Structure formats: C-alpha cells, structure tokens
Design a protein with these regions (language model features):
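Short helix/strand-bridging catalytic loops that position acidic/His residues to coordinate divalent metals
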Residues: 122-131
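Short pre-active-site segment immediately N-terminal to the catalytic Zn-binding motif
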Residues: 87-110, 130
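Long, well-structured alpha-helical subdomains associated
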Residues: 149-214
Length: 214
C-alpha cells in the first residue's frame, strides 16, 4: 500500500500555523486549538515568534522511552500530532484528566504541544532536559485553560487540588505520578497570580529539573 500523500492547509486567521495532513479532517481542530492557545498565552504576553508547522500523522510517536500522541520538535520547528480518528481507533489514550478522550480533549492536547512551541520561541537557550518542568507547567496550564468552562470546572472539582504554593517544587516526577493534579495545580497557580510576569520570566529562564515556587 502506498503511503498517503500529505496536503497543505492554513488557518484562515492564524498565519503562524501551517498544517500538513492526508486530508482536511483535522484542520478545524488544529486551527481551533491554535486560536485558543494563542488567546490564553497572550494574557501572559507570550506570542509565537516564528511559524509553526503542524504535521498530522497516523501513528504514535516514540519519545525518550515512552509513546506519545504528539510532540514539538524545536530543532526542526515542526509539531507532530496523531490524528483524532486514529487515536480513537487505537484506544491508546482512553482518558484525559479523568474524562473520556474526545474532540474537546484533542483540541486541548494540540494546544498543549503548541504551547511547547511558543515556550521555546520565547525562552532563553532552551535545553529540554533542564526546563521540562517549566515547559510542562505552562503546557498543562494552557491545555486545561483552553477547555470549555464546564469541562474545566468538572476536572478541577473532581481532582480537588489547590494551586502550587510557595515553597513547592514543580517537577515532571509529580506530573508523571499525577498528570491531572499537575494540570490543575498549574492552571490554578498561573491564573491566580496577581502579577504573573515575574513568574513567567522564571519559567522562560529556568535551567533546572524542577521549579521552586516563590
């Protein structure tokens, strides 16, 4: 069987995004995710600094010892995302944040990867192994932030976590242990900051395995 030939698409009102996909089924989802992510991140004066190329693929991604549905590769400035139909068919990710994985959560997952791109556009001397915690904090906060208000309320209520507090250490270890709690704590912490810019700068200039909350 010959591989599908990818076509190229653009988001009508988001020139920073270009999409390569076998067909146009995922274009609306990607454009919606980009719009929501850029809107959320703009509140924190974070904007894309260069084009983001999104490639819709039909297989899982093997990344640093585990399988993923999406990733942003800063070296090539390309974002890879598994298509929603293929993802649902494989049953690889039946739930997201304790809820059945569906179109809304797919948009959130795409927004998560777009946030990695925007983070790397704005960060100083990005080295993934050293600033994963900072990137994931922002990516999960955005992923939760772009969901519908009702979905977000249900997730926060079900998890029962409060925001990160002064003295806490934000780490990918905690994220791996409790991704929903990590997302809830990150979203609540970020959105409740009276002046978020100093903390945003901590994230963008972060060079360690965990982030200490001031």
């Amino acid at each position: 069987m010959l591989p599908a030939v990818a076509d190229h698409y653009n988001c009508e009102e988001i020139p920073e995004i270009s999409i390569s996909a076998p067909d146009d089924k995922m274009v609306v989802h990607v454009c919606e995710a980009a719009d929501r992510a850029f809107t959320f991140l703009s509140r924190y004066e974070l904007h894309p600094q260069k084009p983001i190329s999104v490639e819709i693929i039909e297989k899982l991604i093997y990344l640093d010892g585990y399988w993923a549905i999406g990733m942003y590769d800063g070296s090539s400035e390309r974002l890879f995302m598994m298509s929603l139909p293929t993802l649902l068919e494989t049953g690889f990710l039946p739930e997201m944040y304790g809820q059945p994985f569906d179109e809304e959560h797919y948009i959130g997952a795409v927004a998560h990867e777009i946030t990695h791109a925007v983070f790397q556009h704005n960060a100083s001397d990005v080295e993934d192994k050293w600033n994963n915690a900072a990137q994931e904090y922002l990516a999960h906060a955005t992923q939760l932030g772009v969901l519908s208000a009702q979905r977000r309320k249900e997730i926060i209520s079900s998890e029962g976590s409060g925001p990160w507090e002064s003295g806490d250490e934000i780490s990918v270890t905690y994220m791996g242990f409790n991704p929903t709690g990590f997302a809830v704590k990150s979203y609540l912490h970020l959105t409740q900051l009276n002046d978020p810019q100093p903390f945003i700068q901590i994230l963008l200039n972060h060079k360690w395995l965990y982030v200490s909350v001031p």
